[in-house]
Structures are given as C-alpha cells and as structure tokens.
Amino acid sequence: MAAHDDDINRGTRPARGSEDPAGQVAYLEQEIAVLRRKLADSPRHTRILEERIVELQTNLAGVSAQNERLANTLREARDQIVALKEEVDRLAQPPAGFGVFLQANEDGTCDIFTGGRKLRVNVSPSVELDDLRRGQEVMLNEALNVVEAMQFERAGDIVTLKEILEDGERALVVGHTDEERVVRLAEPLLDITIRSGDALLLDSRSGYVYEVVPKSEVEELVLEEVPDIDYDKIGGLGDQIELIRDAVELPYLHPDLFKEHELRPPKGILLYGPPGCGKTLIAKAVANSLAKKVAEVTGQPAGKSYFLNIKGPELLNKYVGETERHIRLVFQRAREKASEGTPVIVFFDEMESLFRTRGSGVSSDVENTIVPQLLAEIDGVEGLENVIVIGASNREDMIDPAILRPGRLDVKIKIERPDAEAAKDIFAKYLTPGLPLHADDLSEHTGSREAAAHAMIQSVVERMYTESEENRFLEVTYANGDKEVLYFKDFNSGAMIQNIVDRAKKMAIKAFLEQGQKGLRVAHLLQACVDEFKENEDLPNTTNPDDWARISGKKGERIVFIRTLVTGKQGADTGRSIDTVANTGQYL
C-alpha cells in the first residue's frame, strides 16, 4: 500500500534513454520529496515500534508468570498423584505378619514361630541375622520372610518359675491354675539370675518367657536387707540379748566346736511377752549383729546376712492353699540365700496370727494346713542349714504346741516388762547428755550434762514406779474372789518410755517457742509421764478381761472383772466396769 502511494506521489519515472531533462528533474524532485517525508515520519514510527515492543514485553512477562504457575500446579498435581498412587499401592499390599525368632541357620535362613507353626524362612538383606536374639519379634512379608526386626513381647500371662532345667535354656513354670509347663527362656533372661518363685512374663503362643515381673505377692511380705539396729540401742534386756547371742551367733561363728561336742544348733527361737517390750527390736538387732560377726570372722569389710521379715496377717490368703504356697516360697528363698554360706534369719512377727493351735478355729480350719506346712519346712526332709527361725508373739498360749516343742523352736525367751533398773537403761537410750538441757537443771549439777541427764532419769523412774495413790491403775478380780490392785508400773514398756521422752521433747520445743527458754527440764519429763498415764486410762478395752490380761502379760488365775482406779482431772474416779469403756488404748 505504501509502495503504491509512493508510486503515485513520485509519478511516472521517465523511460530509460529519455532525453527529456525536465521530466527527469521533476521525477527526482518528487523522489526527494518522498524521501524527505519518510525521513520526517521515521521518529514517529520508531516511537510506535518501541511502545509496541514494551507492550509485547509486558505481555510476555505476564504469560511467563502464568506459565510458571501452571508448571507449579502441574508439579503439585503430579506429586499428589504419586502420593495417592503410593497410598493406593500401600493399601493394596497384603498384611505383614509377625513371628518370633527361634534360631539362625548356617545357610543364612532362620527358624521362626508364627501362626502356631514353626517355619524356616529367608532373611531380607536389610536385616542383620547376627543381631537377632532368641525370642525377639520379627516382621514378615507376604512370603513369610523376615523383613524387619522388632522389640520383645511386652504383654502376656504371668507364671511362676519352679525350676530351671539342666540345659539352662528352658524352665518349668506353674500357671495360675497350677498347670505346669516347660517354656523357653528368651535371651534377656539368659543374662540375669532368676530364682524359684519369681513371676515371669509368658507369651503362651510362642512358649517364651521374656522378663521377670515385679510382683508384690511375696516381695511385700519379705524384707531382705538387714535393719540398721544393734544391741547397743536396746535397753533393759541384757539377759535376753545374751541368751539370743548364745542361740544364734555361737553356732554360726564356732561350728567346729558344736560339731566336736555333737551339739545341734537350735532351729528356732520364740520371743514372747507383752506388747511394746522389744521383741521385734531384738529380732532386727540379731541380723545386724550377726552380719558384723561374720565380717569379723571372714575378714571382709562388710559382713552379709539376710533378714526375711514375714508379716503374718498379710501372708494369709482367702484361697485354699495360697498361704501354704507363700510359706514354701519364703523358705525356698531362705534356702537359696543360705546355700551360699550366708546366715539367714526368718522372722515371723505376730506368730499366733498364722500358727494357731489346730482345731481352735471358729469359722475355718485354715490352721490345720498352715501349721503342718511350717513344721515340714523346719524339720522336714529338706534340712535348714544356716537358717534360723525367730517368732514373736504376745499370745504364746495360742501357738500350736507342735511348733513350740524342742527341735523346732528350741529356745524360748520371755521379754518381760521393764523393772525400775531396766527402765533407767531404756531412758538412757533416748534421754542422752547430748540433748539440749535447760540451764537451771544444769546449774543444779555444776554444769555436768551427764549428771543432769542421770538425775532426770532417776526422777521420772521414781515417779513411774512408785506404788502411790496417783499411780493406781486397775483393780482386778480373780475367779477365786481375790482382788489385786495393779499400778501403771505393771503395764510399763519400752514403747511407753520412748513415748514419754518424745512428749517431754515436744514440751521443751513449745516452751522455747513461747518463752524463749531453750532446753529440756525434769518438769517436762514428769508432766509427760502424767499425760501418758492419763492417755492410757482407757487402755483395757475388751469385754473379755482374761484375754486382755493375757495379752498384757498377766498370767495365772483367771480374771473375771476389771475396775479402773485412775485419778482423773475431776478427782478420784470411783472405778468403772470394763464393759463401759469405749476408747482405744495404744498398747493392746
């Protein structure tokens, strides 16, 4: 179109060879005019083209951004499709099974137990065959080959170990229905010591036991560590302690002398007497003293002995045969410890609660089987070497006579209520010169703490043991009609003495907080003694006076009536029948 305009504007060019100069000049002038016009229009066209280029570049940038967004969307869609495909493929896969590893074979395969079958399968290269342990759970693919190692089973049935078989890899266990079964020991159990009576975790499907389960069935009844109590902390029982040392320590420390004299060591000791007089304390001190003696004999820095503290009432079980089984487990454990040459003390506290006279039961006859079980353990076919049975009771008359005969509980030691001299010894254990003593009391003894403490003890013991009107406690009537007045000293005990000292210490603390005067005074002890008596004025709290008297340590003629003679805050009490007493005392 532009070329056509140019041809019009230019006109017709003269023919070649034309001799008309005017025509040529006119043509050239037109050509020059056209060129001048084009030259004038050139910047405008250039500007238009530049604007067009900018517009195109802008459009190109927008299209590129849109293209990038589309590409990102496509990539995300592709990733989602791939993930969905993997999810579909995963959900479409057959379920993976589990099995229990039994053993590895030389050809690179292994034996497993799964689905009630024992199989020999291949192992994935990603699993180290040497790292698999007996009893370990493994994951299987659809071909039942091992593809991953798992943990050991953590759930199952509880069984009781009876014994380890000779190969050391199997065990005889007893289930909850007393059914015996031979099981395999998983590898974790091969590295530890397990003993008869331990509760084990059993996978009944594979027949493996995996771990020892802490079970309070026997553990809560047995305290194996030796108590940190020695004879020096026991006051007023020197003669009884000497008897126990002769019965317990001599046979173990000098077995050659006993053998030379053909003397059999005692199998058991019975500590009997009223409550709160130190029976349990002595039994604890026996184990500690024996451990120290063993250290002296063997030359070891720390001697070793075991103290099995059997809590009688907790040993009882409502199921038939369970109590007897617990007793067997206790003595089985004692034999295991004693087989190492270590002395073992089996202590039955409140012995009458377990081993009552056979036939004395009212609602049951459980003692008819419990007592023979203990007798069989003490002197049955299996002897007790290095095992000493100690029983404590405040109703020894209720214990079956077969247990108390010689050859079983040979040594019988009565723990009496403390007299005045024994009470001084007991007070000296709790009222020591190292306590904060009041300056006034110290000044009376020229500042000597030992003399002041001794004088305090002397004063409070005289207050407790004086047969005065204020110390009268009970009037008892015997079956023959005789009457007797009993004083508080007749019911004194080491536990009561400790309580009196503790009361006095609390009074001293309160006096310091209220008055600013620090130190224990003899007045605190005397007041504590009075408060202790007042608190226990309702101590006889049973409707059977004779039973109460037997528990309290009063033996002899049967008591048919008890009348209290305590001087109360309102003056002298005329006495009252025991049937009307409602409060509960501490020491029964």
From Swiss-Prot:
Record's protein name: Proteasome-associated ATPase
Family of the protein in this entry: Belongs to the AAA ATPase family.
Tell me the segments the record calls region Disordered.
1-22
Q: Which portions of the chain have biased composition (kind: Basic and acidic residues)?
A: 1-10
**Example GO molecular function:** ATP binding
Q: In which pathway does it act?
A: Protein degradation; proteasomal Pup-dependent pathway
Record gene name: arc
Which residues of this UniProt protein bind ATP?
A: 276-281
- Which GO terms fall under biological process for this protein? modification-dependent protein catabolic process; proteasomal protein catabolic process
| Reported function | ATPase which is responsible for recognizing, binding, unfolding and translocation of pupylated proteins into the bacterial 20S proteasome core particle. May be essential for opening the gate of the 20S proteasome via an interaction with its C-terminus, thereby allowing substrate entry and access to the site of proteolysis. Thus, the C-termini of the proteasomal ATPase may function like a 'key in a lock' to induce gate opening and therefore regulate proteolysis.
Q: Which keywords accompany this UniProt record?
A: ATP-binding, Chaperone, Coiled coil, Nucleotide-binding, Proteasome
Q: Where is this region: Docks into pockets in the proteasome alpha-ring?
A: 587-588
Query: Coiled-coil ranges per the record?
Result: 47-94
User: Matching InterPro entries, A to Z?
Assistant: AAA+_ATPase, AAA_ATPase_domain, ATPase_AAA_core, ATPase_AAA_CS, NA-bd_OB-fold, P-loop_NTPase, Prot_ATP_ID_OB_2nd, Prot_ATP_ID_OB_N
Supply the domain comment: Consists of three main regions, an N-terminal coiled-coil domain that binds to protein Pup and functions as a docking station, an interdomain involved in ARC hexamerization, and a C-terminal ATPase domain of the AAA type.
Q: Has the keyword Chaperone been applied to this entry?
A: yes
GO CC field:
proteasome complex
Q: What domain of life does the UniProt record list for this protein's source?
A: Bacteria
Assembly and binders: Homohexamer. Assembles into a hexameric ring structure that caps the 20S proteasome core. Strongly interacts with the prokaryotic ubiquitin-like protein Pup through a hydrophobic interface; the interacting region of ARC lies in its N-terminal coiled-coil domain. There is one Pup binding site per ARC hexamer ring. Upon ATP-binding, the C-terminus of ARC interacts with the alpha-rings of the proteasome core, possibly by binding to the intersubunit pockets.
Q: Which Pfam families match?
A: AAA, Prot_ATP_ID_OB_C, Prot_ATP_ID_OB_N
